A protein has these predicted regions:
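Alpha/beta enzyme core
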Residues: 1-172
Length: 172
């Protein structure tokens, strides 16, 4: 709860909140104005119905949006249930072996176009945003210009709508 209280005191607008913190009864007491996003991985919620159940529970506990690493069909299903969903594109740690390890993604024109395709798929599925992780700055800038959803940069430069930073980096 200390990080949540510190983020509130520092006027942080948006926070990625671990499920154990989100489900703590004091979370919304110490961080009433922060837009809180929480998530489960595709291994923790293996079906669309499991995601739906978990998301509804998280919204009841105070989440404002949910990360979803499930399929685009899962994102669409959640969106159709009026659940604000954020996707994840680029270096997705749980899938790093699929993209060649822990390194930048989107360095070739073909790979950059694939990232744009994924972002557009999230957009078409009804996501409110996407986290773009470890993507070349120029690619992130162009993707941000070509989508109507919010784009959070995590190691993808300042050209996105918001920066994803860790609490140690901004709170000390």
């Amino acid at each position: 709860m200390d990080e949540a209280a510190a983020a509130e005191a520092a006027c942080i607008d948006i926070a990625s909140v671990p499920a154990d913190v989100l489900f703590h009864p004091e979370h919304r007491t110490v961080a009433p104005t922060i837009f809180s996003m929480a998530g489960q991985t595709h291994t923790e919620c293996s079906s669309p119905n499991e995601y739906l159940k978990w998301c509804n529970s998280a919204l009841e506990k105070g989440a404002d949006a949910l990360y979803c690493s499930g399929s685009f069909k899962t994102v669409e299903m959640l969106s159709n249930e009026y659940i604000p969903v954020v996707g994840h594109v680029g270096l997705v740690p749980a899938r790093a072996t699929w993209t060649g390890g822990f390194k930048a993604v989107g360095k070739t024109a073909t790979d950059a176009m694939e990232l744009l395709k994924q972002v557009k798929s999230y957009e078409q599925a009804g996501a409110i945003g996407v986290e773009l992780e470890v993507v070349p700055v120029e690619v992130a800038n162009e993707i941000s210009k070509r989508t109507s959803i919010l784009v959070w940069s995590m190691g993808a430069g300042a050209g996105c709508d918001a920066q994803y930073l860790f609490s140690n980096d901004i709170l000390g």
